[in-house]
Amino acid sequence: VNPANRNLLQGSGTSRAIYQAAGEQELTAACEAIGRCDLGRAVCTPAFGLPAKYIFHAVCPAWHGGGFGEAEQLAGAYHSALELAAEYHCESVAFPLLSSGNYGYPKEQAFRIAVDTITQYVMEHDLTVYLVLYDRDSLAVSRKLFASVEEYIDDHYVAQNDESYGFGRRCRELSERRRLLEEDAALPMLGAVPAPAAAPRTA
């Protein structure tokens, strides 16, 4: 998932890295063909040179103090990209921590929104989701909050849904998957199964 602006122009940081890896000319042309995307929404392009099928461009809010609908817009960007992943029959999708870089969203709040939105979605959809953390501050926040995330899932989902949907198994996998934070700062969140060593091309 590319953290995008409304004009779908190449940004800095993660966005620049995605454009360079995919092929700037091809990806720029694909985004220009789409034109614009509303804040809190996402659009899809081919992945071109990236080892994935698609790139979902999620238009993220900048932080203006929290009183301008930023939380709803950020949750919407995650949800829209997740809906695209389902629409395009993806088995997995990887997100950076949206809006937490140059857009200035406080990392702890950004992480909570990411986890809450992704958790609610994957409880009803068979999709493996990775939240990729690039810096020490984001990793520190994730370590601080992850135990409370597991407790929240247990309290709100497992008891009533375990028999029908196997959510208990999904949640038990969280303990093992948290270990990946210590290894490579990539957090696979609540997917139906752990990603295999030779995983299929992902979005």
Language-model features and meaning:
Residues N2-E87:
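Glycine-/small-residue-enriched capping loops at alpha/beta junctions
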Residues A62-A199:
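Phosphate/ribose-phosphate-bearing ligand recognition and processing surfaces
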